[in-house]
């Protein structure tokens, strides 16, 4: 960075040589403190061979524009240096006296949307001057050690006008101000505001600090703004690009308080609660119906006796203070629950408006918003809730965790049941971030963080069992096919018992971050139902392009197949298709397809909604217990496929025409059947999930839900412990093997052993074989014989492949699959 100065040189003659001093004044006075001295430069004035005089600057080599003049009074000769550029001081220093002011900050924004519909934190700048100001060259930073970290481009702020800057690392330095409606196109910094508080600096091009603000920790939806007189205060309703006096300002936040003695939890007898100790003028007000307290709620100024299950929600109020925290405790009196407990506190309107009891029959889509979203009700409303979790049920001595969250109904026809499925989500607007807790046994200690979970009534299998749908996913643990982990819990709403629910992982962008460590915001996550594709994150463009290419091109052409392999995880796709087929899911492939991709990963498919698997064919047109799944996929499921490129089933129907994919599919089928898709594994996973149930809790739930009275309606007897799943799967083993053999003209199966010796692994058709570690393979299993198999030897870092046990030296090879085949890859 350089600054412009004007310099005056005073010379005195010494023969043909002139010696002088040059005094340079900074013409951009705002770029340095007022007491900074002029720049002194030593010079020598000399003449050239033509007698022309010029100034030689001895200490700063530079080419200068000058002209000579004579003082008319003294006769002294001067050389005026017209422009001299010298390096400016790059140390940020206070200048102030600026028309550009920082007037409001909101680190956790909820309502001021950017041009993408997102809600990043923002900073408001106000031009208090009488003329428009150009922000070009100004820096807006949170750290003076990086004072040019983010610099504005060419952007004007009109006189007496506001401008917000979004802080989200998107790095947009200049933008034409548009979108004055719901969305707002504005500049974006390359850094984020700190939720815990911090500082912000507006620095001019010459490193002068024009304004700065230190802001406190702010909870979701609040802002920190300046009011008349220069004081900074809290705002419950932010005022982006508006005067701050249009909203109520608060001097401080209401202080936190604690209940004296008894906290929420399980008690054998009634509990007496005494009012909390608070500072003068502070009043604690509470509700006991699940709703959030207000300034009009009853004051907690005398003892409260809790003699039955009660949720107590309290907040502190005082004139001039902003209340941001509600303390919630659920008290259980005389309850005995041996399973984990989820206690949900929610406004009673959730039940009167949405969580309605029905008597069955077809939903009234025109009048009841509780049913699946439709044209009249495009999405389920989400209400704020408080969730408390007791890991050991009534034996818990304290809450394992608690969190503010949101709740909404989910599911379709299963909403007709008394017990309904809901989604619990943690969002910034509720003050919640990631929940760090091992919710699911199979992920314990791996990456225990979640942005929410589902509480399912077991969907369409509501009258059949507790967890068959979950078993269908659990058998895939370790296979690389995504599924939603599960556990059984008991749910209470506002202290009222609602029975056993299936706590389930949520499928969305956050699932990918939890399970793969990939930034959630980089993920495309899609739902494919029939011929409709929607994205819950990212866009549908890549997915639709993938469908168009694979479904619209000849996959027997090698180049096309190679392109397909770059678009989807081909091994994952094969394993996913095999799992759906084995489970015999009739509500697929024209429904319930989920997939995701990221910059690092091609499209991966995810097992979802297996209610109509495991011999449950109720209400699926054209599907029965004897339906051949290959024929079902070829026809596109119950809705058919025809030649439409939006048909999901067509992906398989086209790819299977390629001999390489057919070979991969058959060999993957051998491994999947041997290690994951078999009766023994189904039985083991059913026992694992049944072990999460408690007999007394099951008896209570069954009595409340009256499953026994519903058996005749659906011709299914209730199977709480999943005892029917194993026997069904044992029969399915032989049945599905027969379907595969018939489909591909195979005659039998034989034992194949694949191993490594030294530090390296063997991939079978790109698959890490079960039991492999990061540096070794040792697998033995049954394979369909009569075809070929691709094997690839992969050394770990520092090792080299030294050949196969049969003398072959190529790392990648094809072998005939025969009974007794044994191959070892050697590494050294």
Region annotations inferred by a language model:
Residues 240-247, 340-345, 349-367, 374-377, ...:
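Middle-to-C-terminal accessory/interaction subdomains
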Residues 87-144, 192-196, 213-217, 247-260:
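A structural motif detector for short, solvent-exposed N-terminal "entry" segments of globular domains
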Residues 344, 362-534, 538:
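Conserved ATP-binding subdomain of kinase catalytic cores across diverse folds
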Residues 9-20:
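Bacterial N-terminal signal peptides
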Residues 101, 105, 156-159, 165, ...:
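Short, compositionally stereotyped local motifs that mark structural "simplifiers"
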Residues 110-119, 146-231, 359-382, 386-388:
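Solvent-exposed beta-edge/loop recognition patches
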Residues 18-51, 63, 73-76, 88-93:
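Bacterial Sec-dependent N-terminal signal peptides
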């Amino acid at each position: 960075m350089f600054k412009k100065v004007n310099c005056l040189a005073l010379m005195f003659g010494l023969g043909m040589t002139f010696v002088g001093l040059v005094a340079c004044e900074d013409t951009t006075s705002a770029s340095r403190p007022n007491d900074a001295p002029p720049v002194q430069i030593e010079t020598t004035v000399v003449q050239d061979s033509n007698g022309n005089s010029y100034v030689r600057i001895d200490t700063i080599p530079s080419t200068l524009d000058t002209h000579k003049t004579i003082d008319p009074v003294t006769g002294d000769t001067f050389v005026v240096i017209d422009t001299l550029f010298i390096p400016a001081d790059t140390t940020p220093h206070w200048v102030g006296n600026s028309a550009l002011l920082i007037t409001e900050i909101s680190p956790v924004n909820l309502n001021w949307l950017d041009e993408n519909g997102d809600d990043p934190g923002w900073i408001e700048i106000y031009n208090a001057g009488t003329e428009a100001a150009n922000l070009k060259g100004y820096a807006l930073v949170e750290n003076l050690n990086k004072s040019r970290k983010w610099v504005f481009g060419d952007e004007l702020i009109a006189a007496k006008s506001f401008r917000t800057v979004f802080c989200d690392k998107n790095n947009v330095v200049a933008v034409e101000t548009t979108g004055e409606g719901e969305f707002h196109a504005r500049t974006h910094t390359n850094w984020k505001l700190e939720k815990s508080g911090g500082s912000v600096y507006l620095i001019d091009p010459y490193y002068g600090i024009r304004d700065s603000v230190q802001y406190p920790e702010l909870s979701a939806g609040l802002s920190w703004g300046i009011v008349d007189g220069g004081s900074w205060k809290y705002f419950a309703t932010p005022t982006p690009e508006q005067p701050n006096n249009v909203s109520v300002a608060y001097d401080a936040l209401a202080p936190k308080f604690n209940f004296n003695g008894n906290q929420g939890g399980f008690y054998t007898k009634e509990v007496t609660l005494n009012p909390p100790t608070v500072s003068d003028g502070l009043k604690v007000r509470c509700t006991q119906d699940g709703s959030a307290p207000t300034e009009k709620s009853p004051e907690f100024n005398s003892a409260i006796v809790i003699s039955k299950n009660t949720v107590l929600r309290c907040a502190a109020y005082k004139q001039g203070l902003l209340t941001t925290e509600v303390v919630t405790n659920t008290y259980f009196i005389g309850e005995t629950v041996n399973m984990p407990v989820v206690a949900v506190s929610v406004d009673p309107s959730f039940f009167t408006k949405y969580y309605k009891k029905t008597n069955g029959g077809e939903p009234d889509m025109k009048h009841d918003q509780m049913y699946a979203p439709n044209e009249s009700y495009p999405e389920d409303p989400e209400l704020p809730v408080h969730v408390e979790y007791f890991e050991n049920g009534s034996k818990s001595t304290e809450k394992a965790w608690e969190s503010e969250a949101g709740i909404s109904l989910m599911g379709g026809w299963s909403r007709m049941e008394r017990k309904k499925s809901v989604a619990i989500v943690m969002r910034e607007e509720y003050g919640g971030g990631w929940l760090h807790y091992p919710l699911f046994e199979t992920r314990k200690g791996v990456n225990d963080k979640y942005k929410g979970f589902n509480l399912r009534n077991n969907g369409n299998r509501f009258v059949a069992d507790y967890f068959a749908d979950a078993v269908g996913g659990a058998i895939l643990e370790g296979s690389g096919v995504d599924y939603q982990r599960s556990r059984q819990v008991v749910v209470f709403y506002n202290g009222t018992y609602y029975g056993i629910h299936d706590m389930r992982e949520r499928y969305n962008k956050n699932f990918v971050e939890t399970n793969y460590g990939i930034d959630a915001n980089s993920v495309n996550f899609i739902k494919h139902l029939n011929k409709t594709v929607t994205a819950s994150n990212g866009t549908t463009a890549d997915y639709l392009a993938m469908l168009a290419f694979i479904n619209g091109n000849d996959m027997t052409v090698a180049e096309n197949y190679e392109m397909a392999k770059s678009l989807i995880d081909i091994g994952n796709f094969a394993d996913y298709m095999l799992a759906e087929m084995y489970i015999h899911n009739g509500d697929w492939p024209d429904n319930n397809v989920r997939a995701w991709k990221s910059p690092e990963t091609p499209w991966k498919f995810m097992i979802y909604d297996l209610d109509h698997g495991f011999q449950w064919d109720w209400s699926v047109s054209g599907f029965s217990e004897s339906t051949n799944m290959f024929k079902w996929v070829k026809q596109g499921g119950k809705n058919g496929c025809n030649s439409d490129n939006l048909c999901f089933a067509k992906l398989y129907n086209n790819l299977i025409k390629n001999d390489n994919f057919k070979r991969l599919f058959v060999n993957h089928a051998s491994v999947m059947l041997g290690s994951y898709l078999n009766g023994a594994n189904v039985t083991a996973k059913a026992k694992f999930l049944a072990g999460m149930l408690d007999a007394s809790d099951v008896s209570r739930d069954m009595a409340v839900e009256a499953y026994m009275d519903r058996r005749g309606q659906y011709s299914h007897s209730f199977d709480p412990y999943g005892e029917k799943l194993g026997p069904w799967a044992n029969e399915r083993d032989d049945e599905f093997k027969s379907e595969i053999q018939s489909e591909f003209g195979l005659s039998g199966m034989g034992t194949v052993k694949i191993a490594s010796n030294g530090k390296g692994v063997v991939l079978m058709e790109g698959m890490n074989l079960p039991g492999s570690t990061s540096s070794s393979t040792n697998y033995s299993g049954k394979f369909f014989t009569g075809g070929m198999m691709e094997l690839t030897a992969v050394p770990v870092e520092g090792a080299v492949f030294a050949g196969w046990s049969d003398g072959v030296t190529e790392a990648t090879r094809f072998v005939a699959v025969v009974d007794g085949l044994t191959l070892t890859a050697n590494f050294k």
